[in-house]
């Protein structure tokens, strides 16, 4: 594994390339796969995210049964890539995801999930701020 800075730089660079393919930035759906997905709208890239997530699961199951573990990396890369397209569409970046992961650092997954349930219940209360 390379240094975190290198990982951050790679994600930031890829995010900039994806952002350059947004329709409002002149992305050309005739010459760019990313621009084509963005031009088609959320249903197109969200469908790809679902497909790629399924492929991650299948690669992991194969790896559990003696298959090539590097295929998990390949499929996760596809999933991350398509998730980054979604982030760009919604005006977000990988840095926003890292901030959220940092916020969760040191918090038990069980505790974090319990807090989400409490927050959801509070939001459902009559008179809750909308």
Curated annotation (Swiss-Prot):
Pathway: Amino-acid biosynthesis; L-histidine biosynthesis; L-histidine from 5-phospho-alpha-D-ribose 1-diphosphate: step 2/9. Its EC number is 3.6.1.31. Belongs to the PRA-PH family. It comes from the Bacteria. It is found in: Cytoplasm. It comes from Albidiferax ferrireducens (strain ATCC BAA-621 / DSM 15236 / T118) (Rhodoferax ferrireducens). Its main location: cytoplasm. GO terms for molecular function: ATP binding; phosphoribosyl-ATP diphosphatase activity. NCBIfam families: histidine_hisI (TIGR03188), PRK00400.1-3 (NF001611). GO terms for cellular component: cytoplasm. Keywords: Amino-acid biosynthesis, ATP-binding, Cytoplasm, Histidine biosynthesis, Hydrolase, Nucleotide-binding. This is Phosphoribosyl-ATP pyrophosphatase. It is an enzyme of class 3 (hydrolase). It catalyses: 1-(5-phospho-beta-D-ribosyl)-ATP + H2O = 1-(5-phospho-beta-D-ribosyl)-5'-AMP + diphosphate + H(+). One of its GO terms (biological process) is L-histidine biosynthetic process.
